[in-house]
Amino acid sequence: MRHKLILAGGGSGTAEYLLPAAKKALEEVELVIASPRFLELLHARKTMPMGHISELLESLPAMLERESIGIVVSGDPLLYSLCRTLRNRYPELEMQVIPGVGSLQLLGAAFGLTMEQ
């Protein structure tokens, strides 16, 4: 796999929770893969709607031979998300992970609760 992968958390799917670091990194890749709600928030050169994860995992190595890719997932990619799956399946993969604001943080903030409670 010649090119780098950016795995970015998209937060809740609104512009307010898509972090500037994620937007900046995703502008630098050649292809962004995400659900339509995230693709609408980005100004990517080339996009592809997220399909079945199993199909994406199967085709990812060949895709990374051709171009750099950014994948946007809901919430935080480090919490019950795609990061672990990618690391386990492709340990040699060069991947930059950009965290996002997850639903647990949003829920806690809405009720004034800390993550320790």
Task: Locate predicted features.
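Class I S-adenosyl-L-methionine
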Residues: 1-107
